[in-house]
């Protein structure tokens, strides 16, 4: 049986793989077997970490909101979970990202939201929004 020269197609496939891993360190960008393994590993990690990034940012926003809520002038203890529960009761449509940005950039605004929530005792008598 005669030998088949792979030629253009195999070269193109390997070149494409090498371009992907060209910035990898050491032998991770040289031998084609290791290159193939590292490419699979990199794509797997990228896919996993796209979801992880969403979780991490949500945790960060919750931590920032909680820190801002607990730093009140009067020293009244108010937790994040109560704050979010009361926001939903008052039908305030503010997501955690926006609340975290308000907490960092403009503390007075988060205090005013906080005070409005605490002021109204009976939610059914006062359905107006901020």
From Swiss-Prot:
CDD domains: Ribosomal_L20
UniProt GO MF annotations: rRNA binding; structural constituent of ribosome
Entry keyword Protein biosynthesis: no
One Pfam family, short name: Ribosomal_L20
Primary localisation category: plastid
UniProt keyword list: Chloroplast, Plastid, Ribonucleoprotein, Ribosomal protein, RNA-binding, rRNA-binding
Localization annotation: Plastid, Chloroplast
Coiled-coil ranges from the UniProt annotation: none
GO (cellular component) term, any one: ribosome
GO biological process, one term: ribosomal large subunit assembly
Xref: Gene3D superfamilies: 6.10.160.10, Ribosomal protein L20 (1.10.1900.20)
UniProt similarity note: Belongs to the bacterial ribosomal protein bL20 family.
PANTHER family listed in its UniProt record: 39S RIBOSOMAL PROTEIN L20 (PTHR10986)
HAMAP family per the UniProt record, alphabetical: Ribosomal_bL20
Function (record text): Binds directly to 23S ribosomal RNA and is necessary for the in vitro assembly process of the 50S ribosomal subunit. It is not involved in the protein synthesizing functions of that subunit.
Protein's recorded name: Large ribosomal subunit protein bL20c
Source organism: Fagopyrum esculentum subsp. ancestrale (Wild buckwheat)
Lineage, highest ranks first: Eukaryota, Viridiplantae, Streptophyta, Embryophyta, Tracheophyta
């Amino acid at each position: 049986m005669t030998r088949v020269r792979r030629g253009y197609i195999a070269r193109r496939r390997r070149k494409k793989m090498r371009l992907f891993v060209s910035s990898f360190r050491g032998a991770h960008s040289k031998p084609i077997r290791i290159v193939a393994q590292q490419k699979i590993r990199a794509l797997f990690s990228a896919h996993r970490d796209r979801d992880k990034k969403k979780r991490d940012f949500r945790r960060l926003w919750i931590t920032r909101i909680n820190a801002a809520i607990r730093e009140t002038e009067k020293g009244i203890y108010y937790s994040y979970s109560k704050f979010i529960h009361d926001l939903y009761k008052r039908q305030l449509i503010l997501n955690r990202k926006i609340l975290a940005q308000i907490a960092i950039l403009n503390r007075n605004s988060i205090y005013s939201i906080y005070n409005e929530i605490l002021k109204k005792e009976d939610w059914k008598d006062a359905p107006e929004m901020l």
